[in-house]
Curated annotation (Swiss-Prot):
Coiled coil: none
GO biological process: one example: cellular response to osmotic stress
Domain of life per record: Eukaryota
Keywords (A to Z) from UniProt: Stress response
Biological role stated in the UniProt entry: Involved in osmoadaptation.
InterPro entries xrefs: ConA-like_dom_sf (IPR013320), DUF1349 (IPR009784)
Induction info: Up-regulated when grown with elevated levels of potassium chloride.
One Pfam match: DUF1349
Protein's name in the database: Uncharacterized protein AN7484
Record-annotated disulphide pairs: none
């Protein structure tokens, strides 16, 4: 598996395959990953990722936190499917600040994006999430709390996509608001696992 690359990221990307146990991703204001009819398409948020063949993906996990303060502040894990024809589909899961507090948030974008929310456990500002390719080829998203693994979302279509050039697996941060300066998201213990058993 190749090393890390980035999109929309100003910081230097590690040249080898190893990230520090803890690292940050900084999102400037007016950055987002979103798609809503009739014509909203935004994909300018910083992403740190590894590029893999989609059919090799097994799972990804990360712990993360931030001082979420502006509406729609967000960060977490992301999977991007880059199509051979230039189209792009994606799934992102993390924490998003909305309705005056942080929520566990998952958005899946096929033609357009949907969005689901759950409370953050204990009303906190951090979480550990894992995305897994299950034996039935669904993508499942889990909240990890110690030894407890709680399912929070199933996305059925990801591994049924046929016209995929490559997949980006990694982390992202976004601050759609124009206020508040940069959003800094703290990440720890990122794991990216593929079928050849190569990990981070």
């Amino acid at each position: 598996m190749a090393g890390f690359a980035s999109a929309n990221l100003l910081e230097r990307v590690p040249e080898d395959e190893v990230l520090p146990a803890e690292f940050t991703v900084k999102a400037p204001p007016e950055t987002d990953i979103w798609a809503k009819p009739p014509s909203t398409e935004r994909f300018n948020a910083p992403i740190l990722y590894k590029s893999i063949p989609l059919d090799t993906f097994k799972r990804a996990r990360v712990a993360f936190s931030a001082n979420w303060s502006q509406k729609y502040d967000q960060g977490g894990l992301i999977i991007v499917l880059n199509g051979n024809s230039g189209d792009r589909k994606w799934v992102k899961t993390g924490i998003e600040f909305t309705h005056d507090k942080p929520h566990l948030s998952t958005v899946a974008k096929d033609r357009w994006a949907d969005w689901s929310l759950l409370p953050v456990p204990s009303g906190g500002t951090g979480a550990t999430l894992e995305v897994v390719r299950e034996p039935d080829d669904s993508l499942w998203i889990y909240l990890i709390q110690g030894v407890q693994k709680s399912p929070i979302r199933e996305v059925t279509w990801v591994f049924a996509e046929e016209d995929v050039r490559d997949a980006w697996i990694g982390v992202y941060a976004a601050r759609p608001s124009s206020a508040g300066g940069d959003l800094v998201v703290n990440f720890a213990s990122l794991i990216i696992e593929v079928t050849d058993s190569t990990t981070k």
